[in-house]
Design a protein with these regions (language model features):
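Bacterial N-terminal signal peptides
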Residues: 12-23
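Bacterial N-terminal signal peptides that target proteins for export
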Residues: 2-14
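Eukaryotic scaffold repeat domains enriched in small/polar residues
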Residues: 26-347
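Compositionally biased, low-complexity segments enriched in small residues
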Residues: 1-2, 19
Length: 347
């Protein structure tokens, strides 16, 4: 389906100059100030390089090392040509290249941000939810209207032809009944393995494992139970959205709030990744300005649970990542009108 941009800017910032260099932290603390960053949407770190997507169509590269953090370059631009984007949703680092996901293309760049080619996809995918799997792709699509919502996971070959439908889920919650803690149904790929994650308000989180051809192998149930909806949780979910509403939508907040629907329970998670041989999930359990994360091995055995700084949900992207046993996250410093990189040790 066609997607609209749902980003918003936190504040206009026009800062030039060198990046402040700070040593990497041993515990939770400021790592660096990032004057190059104005409107971040996504962050990831791999092999000593940090990539931050911002302003819809570009990304910054920084290096992280014993001497601190240093700005390298910015790559990407708006357009429809080679190496150009109408929107960048995510960057996936691999051993020798980057995959950069847009609305209808998957572009390849070197680890240093040099363009190296791209493929376009003609199938429908919601907000860049496309992964390479074997010689083809797996895509998640989301369609919704006033009456309800439908999510599908499909496998395609290298020529964009449908191979099979992995699964589909639907609900009666649509544009007139907006559920901010909706069920979670998504795909992740690591190597030649497809993981389909399902979390609902009725049962624990399940991860179903498929091979590269879409043949089901097994299902792993994670000890992440649905969370009771309380007035405090409801307020925690609404507040970040309400606080930024006037900057992100022309619709009056009171009108939008009338359409909100909160079930009696939230699903066991709202974020999931497969990273460094682990499952990592973010739950709906808030404690002050922190939220619970949990990690599991690939057999579903729990490795750790920890409350970590909350960076927002919904349209403001993913402003955190895990790297070398630390939780790195971006935080706005309004007083200095600058974005900062912080980190907290996990164990």
């Amino acid at each position: 389906m066609t997607q609209e941009k749902t980003r918003f800017s936190f504040f206009p910032l026009a800062v030039a100059g060198a990046l402040a260099l700070l040593t990497l932290p041993a515990a939770a603390e400021l790592v660096a100030k990032l004057p190059q960053v104005m409107d971040p949407f996504f962050i990831t770190i791999a092999d000593g390089r940090m990539y931050i997507v911002e302003s819809d169509v570009s990304a910054h590269i920084f290096t992280l090392g014993p001497q601190g953090v240093a700005f390298v370059k910015t790559f990407g631009r708006e357009g429809q040509g080679p190496g150009e984007f109408d929107f960048i949703y995510t960057i996936r680092p691999f051993k020798d290249h980057l995959e950069v996901l847009g609305n209808t293309k998957l572009a390849r760049f070197s680890l240093d941000g040099e363009y190296a080619g791209e493929v376009t996809f003609t199938f429908s995918a919601f907000k860049g939810a496309v992964y390479r799997l074997g010689d083809g792709y797996v895509a998640r699509d989301l369609n919704f209207d006033e009456k309800g919502m439908a999510t599908t996971l499909r496998l395609y070959d290298r020529d964009n032809r449908l191979v099979k439908e992995i699964g589909a889920r639907s609900s009666s919650e649509g544009l007139n009944k907006i559920n901010l803690v909706s069920d979670y149904y998504a795909a992740r790929v690591a190597g030649d393995t497809l993981y389909v994650i399902e979390a609902s308000r009725d049962k624990p989180v399940a991860v179903t494992v498929y091979d590269r051809t879409g043949v089901e192998q097994k299902t792993i149930v994670l000890p992440l139970e649905p969370v009771k909806m309380t007035p405090a949780l409801r307020e925690a979910v609404i507040k970040p959205l309400k606080d930024t509403w006037s900057r992100s939508s022309p619709t009056p907040w009171a009108e939008y709030e009338k359409r909100l629907f909160f079930p009696d329970r939230a699903p066991g998670l709202d974020y999931f990744e497969v990273s460094d041989g682990k499952f990592i999930a973010r739950t709906w359990k808030y404690r002050g300005d922190q939220v619970e994360f949990a990690a599991f091995d690939l057999q579903g055995r729990e490795l750790w649970r920890k409350d970590l700084p909350f960076t927002g949900r919904l349209s403001n992207g993913t402003l955190f990542c895990f790297y070398q046993g630390r939780y790195f996250y971006l935080r706005e410093n309004p007083a200095e009108e600058v974005w900062e990189l912080h980190a907290e040790k996990i164990l």
